[in-house]
Amino acid sequence: MSDDEGISIYDEVEIEDMTFDEAMGVYQFPCPCGDKFQITLEDLLDEQDIAVCPSCSLMIRVIFDLDDLPKPPTSGASGGQVPITA
C-alpha cells in the first residue's frame, strides 16, 4: 500500500486489534516503549499503512481493507477544512 522501501517495520498488526478513538479519528496500538502507535483514519483512507510511535522510532504496518474503514465525518461543504490567515 505505501512506498516504504528502506523503512524498518517492527511488526504487522490487523486493524481489528487496534483501538479507535472516534473523537480524535486515530487508531492506536500499544508500543513496547509504553506509548502507543498511532495512525489517523485520514491516513488510512489515503491508503497509508504505517503507524508510528510518537515516543520512539518504532513503526508498524497496519493490515486493513479500505472498504471496511468507517466513513469520515462530513462537516460542511469545505470538507472540514478551515482557511487560516496569517
UniProtKB/Swiss-Prot annotation:
It is found in: Cytoplasm; Nucleus. Keywords: Cytoplasm, Iron, Metal-binding, Nucleus, Oxidoreductase. Fe cation binds at C31, C33, C53, C56. Pathway: Protein modification; peptidyl-diphthamide biosynthesis. InterPro entries: DPH3/4-like, DPH_MB_dom, DPH_MB_sf. Component of the 2-(3-amino-3-carboxypropyl)histidine synthase complex composed of DPH1, DPH2, DPH3 and a NADH-dependent reductase, predominantly CBR1. This is Diphthamide biosynthesis protein 3. The gene is DPH3.
